[in-house]
Amino acid sequence: MKSIPGDIPQYLLIKAQLQARIQSGALKSGDKLPSERELCAIFNTTRITIRESLAQLESSGLIWRADRRGWFVTPERLWLDPTQNTNFHKLCREQGREPKTALLSGVLTTVPVEVMEPLQLQPFDQIYLLTRLRYADGRAVCYCENHCLPARVPELLQYDLNGSLTEVYESHYNLVYTSMHLSFYPTAMPAQAAQALGVMEGRPALLLRRLNYDQHGRVLDLDIEYWRHDSLRIEVDTH
């Protein structure tokens, strides 16, 4: 939008006012913002300006958009300590959040080239590929691809995979996650993950890649996770 030289653009002023209301607690986690039309009336401006203000707040991780429902104040981020042996469901409950995992697909397929080496497989070996969506308090926060070894977990697809995979491993195979190699870095949200999470393709995301080991020190599976950029923080205490 045009502005007088030296003046702060109106969309930044509106962003600052909304940000102040969020940070002061006047707008709390999970609160719904007024509609774009209502915000136009409140700030006496155009919808284009309001949308720019909202986009700035979304990029900052302060608000998020739910399809056909509007804009909401972003919940507090889940925090992950990579030194702790935990799983998504346990992590959520320990932080007072309600977890849910939904299985999108589960197939026996040829191992993708990019995970062949860490899983110690050969070309054309088979894996179970699970694609799952994880929710915290009803909000989709993570798109996960689980690459599982049929030799370690035969007939895996016969079980209910809409919950904790950790519990399935323990109850049906007597296998326990005990250690992992974790890498994480920012990336752009790929198309399939973006569609599942309800965000635009190419939006910022946090990618976590975990190579998991069981109680015998053997490779168990490999997870590739795409997290919404506003839903997770990683903390490590080295004391």
Swiss-Prot record:
Maps to a phosphate-starvation-inducible locus previously known as PsiC. One of its GO terms (biological process) is negative regulation of DNA-templated transcription. This is Putative transcriptional regulator of 2-aminoethylphosphonate degradation operons. InterPro entries: Bact_HTH_transcr_reg, Chorismate_lyase_/UTRA_dom_sf, Tscrpt_reg_HTH_GntR, Tscrpt_reg_PhnR, UTRA, WH-like_DNA-bd_sf, WH_DNA-bd_sf. Keywords: DNA-binding, Transcription, Transcription regulation. SMART domains: HTH_GNTR, UTRA. PANTHER family: MANNOSYL-D-GLYCERATE TRANSPORT/METABOLISM SYSTEM REPRESSOR MNGR-RELATED, TRANSCRIPTIONAL REGULATOR OF 2-AMINOETHYLPHOSPHONATE DEGRADATION OPERONS-RELATED. Residues 8-76 form the HTH gntR-type domain. It comes from Salmonella typhimurium (strain LT2 / SGSC1412 / ATCC 700720). One of its GO terms (molecular function) is DNA-binding transcription factor activity. It comes from the Bacteria. Induction: Induced when inorganic phosphate is limiting; this is controlled by PhoB. Residues 36-55 bind DNA. CDD domains: WHTH_GntR.
